[in-house]
Amino acid sequence: MLRVCALYPDLMNIYADRGNLLLLRRRCEWRGIGFELAASDLGEPLGRAGEESDLFYIGGGQDRDQRLCAFDLAEVKRDGLHAAAARGAAVLAVCGGYQLLGHSYELGEETLPGAGLVDLNTVRADGPRLIGNVAIEVELPGLERRRVLAGFENHGGRTRLGPDAQPLGRVLRGHGNDGSSGFEGVRAGNVIGTYLHGPLLPKNVWLADWLIARALGREEPLAPLDDGLEAAAHVEARRAAGV
């Protein structure tokens, strides 16, 4: 049984990120793995879901909604999320959700608090937004070889990783965290943050399977599926990025 907790699913869903949750459900069901989805909204401590969920998911949102979620995440859900990550639960945070994983998000005159789950800070830059198709090379524990993640990025924030943070991958095409470092995303144990959306997992089902296996604590590979259509979607996403 895979137990998933979606954080702010109605507010943080600007880029059809709900597709990531649907993909996780289907890939579990097709393998005969049970799937439960819980939601935690504004003002709701993680409580039992924080203690029992195997995977937490947070997507991207509009500026106003992201601001509301930032304060709630820091003041209401922070301790529960830290405890879950410490026991090995997986976390996938996309775009705005990724920005909220760090210490803070500076917006000029205002600074939004973060969950402090990973060592990073984000600053909204005066320059143009970083927009376009993107591909990164990723190396994750348990995978026999390096893999490519492909998607779309659209962010005004520049994310800088601290000394205790490890990037998710190396940029092959696109801008990445800040347009200059050559890195994209962050990974700490089973916690992953990334700017890639579109949504991310339907274009990169290998990452969905990695998250499922890690969340369930499985060492052996998941049973293979007929991924012809999924492979075609991945090839098209890479083609769009020029990789």
Where are the regions that the model predicts?
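A glycine-centered loop/beta-turn motif at secondary-structure junctions
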Residues: 178-216
